[in-house]
């Protein structure tokens, strides 16, 4: 029997917090389904979602600003527990009769200690240490506004030396506010506080597990598609790979995958995909060799944004050409869209933020094929997709490979993209990755790759002078790829990689290491 994984559900309202997606992931890690919606959600939408509990996220605005976001009044009449985090706590206070002020002497950014001064189901028996018989929580604060008086029927549960209302509660209505961020790892007991709210106070059941998700998706595909045929663009990345396997388990030979070799892939990528999917997994795959077509289109193009758009447009055109030959039999187009793509796409429609780079995962495939769309992963985060991949029997090394951008080497070769440059870069990148594996560092860094720079440098090989290309190595460590630190790889390791690249690859005279964080730099160079 397939369990209903959506029986228990938490609704998280986004007030603009940089940690909003992380908050969703933390709840799902508890085995409970939840969704992130905009703060201005309507009463009808809340009723339709029917949450067991509601969490109000933090946000960058001041609650004192005119027209600053407010929660729907219905939230406080829905009869379910509510937890306000940072800004979410402050809007609860204002909307229910409390007061908020901005006191520069009481603002807190970074580490703080919350002293628990009253018993509450939210924090009972949860502490990092005890001082004078009082439990203490080590937390992460990020606020300028402060509550100066709490609403009627609320009590103070916790305080810091500068914030007298760090945790507040209305136990009768099960309304709670915390001034700190439980979703970040810096708040040591954040997991336990969220667990207490979600599982105990909201009485949710933990049915959101990788195996249950897998079985539900496969069953849903069978019901949705039936005996009809599906076409999928297969890239070899995690999302399209897991999508292909879910469809394969659900509809078998009725799935046809299209793999486009654009000449911008990693070393032996195309042959590895053919080996894994066609021979080992018996998927029906159409292979399209299009290297010459992509390189011709990229000839003379130096602007990175233009390169991204050309690669995306050409991929879409070639996919459409191949898919049209299947439209007599196929009625569905599958995509490996994941939940962050949906969230970011929705945000972009209302955001005034400047586009830093074109995103290569959203809206990339043609909508002119008159095929129905199926997106099996659209409710999942990347870490959930990987866990489902393991449930499907896919190898760990395939699922946990470092991210590879949609435009491929096209944005790791700075300037014009040529075949000989792709070959140089592939070899350098392979050496870097090989040595990371040998040193057992590959899974300790979040992403690592080589970049071919558009400059030449003088070198000496034996008694001869050479004037050849420069490679930059890039390795970063990150949790969410929104921010990243450069990896402090040892000098000995970097020397080993540099020597191998220069000695083994004809055409490289110098290797440098990128020590830029994000921000100010982006992870990819283009």
UniProtKB/Swiss-Prot annotation:
Domain (Glutamine amidotransferase type-1): residue spans on this chain? 9-207
Major enzyme class? ligase
| GO CC terms | cytosol
Return the protein name: GMP synthase [glutamine-hydrolyzing]
Q: How is the subunit organization of this protein annotated in UniProt? A: Homodimer.
State which Enzyme Commission number(s) the record gives: 6.3.5.2
Q: Does Ligase show up as a keyword for this record?
A: yes
Give the record's keywords alphabetically. ATP-binding, Glutamine amidotransferase, GMP biosynthesis, Ligase, Nucleotide-binding, Purine biosynthesis
Q: Which cysteines are joined by disulfide bonds?
A: none
Question: Which transformation does this protein catalyse, written as a reaction?
Answer: XMP + L-glutamine + ATP + H2O = GMP + L-glutamate + AMP + diphosphate + 2 H(+)
| Segments forming domain GMPS ATP-PPase | 208-401
Annotated InterPro entries: Class_I_gatase-like, GATASE, GMP_synth_C, GMP_synth_GATase, GMP_synthase, GMPS_ATP_PPase_dom, NAD/GMP_synthase, Rossmann-like_a/b/a_fold
Instruction: Return the Gene3D superfamilies for the record.
Output: 3.30.300.10, 3.40.50.880, HUPs
Supply the gene name.
guaA
Q: Which residues catalyse the reaction?
A: 86, 181, 183
**From which organism does this entry originate?**
Baumannia cicadellinicola subsp. Homalodisca coagulata
Its UniProt pathway annotation is: Purine metabolism; GMP biosynthesis; GMP from XMP (L-Gln route): step 1/1
PANTHER family to which the protein is assigned, alphabetical = GMP SYNTHASE [GLUTAMINE-HYDROLYZING], GMP SYNTHASE-RELATED
Q: Name one Pfam family in it.
A: GMP_synt_C
Q: What's this chain's function?
A: Catalyzes the synthesis of GMP from XMP.
Q: Which residues are involved in binding ATP?
A: 235-241
Molecular function per GO: ATP binding; GMP synthase activity
